[in-house]
């Protein structure tokens, strides 16, 4: 009886650990693995939204993908930044790219 309880507890702990790991893995699954800097969901989300907004303006599929290339460190991202974001915030966005990038 004690052995059965021990096995049941072990299974429950193992399942909880694997679920937590899977949830943690899935959080990062949406972002480019080339982003080798600090993982910050808020910054990555903000940069990604800029690319989404840029795609919504230009409606060209390549804009959405190229904007995110090389962890947002590319000419398309810069063009989107210049087009959509006020000039006084450009340095802030470039700092975000440096934080999450290489």
From Swiss-Prot:
InterPro entries listed in its UniProt record: Crust_neurhormone_CS, Crust_neurohorm, Crust_neurohorm_sf, Hyperglycemic, Hyperglycemic1
Gene expressing this chain: CHH3
MF GO annotations: neuropeptide hormone activity
Main location as per UniProt: secreted
Signal peptide interval: 1-22
Family assignment from sequence similarity: Belongs to the arthropod CHH/MIH/GIH/VIH hormone family.
PROSITE patterns: CHH_MIH_GIH (PS01250)
Protein name per the record: Crustacean hyperglycemic hormones 3
Native source species: Penaeus monodon
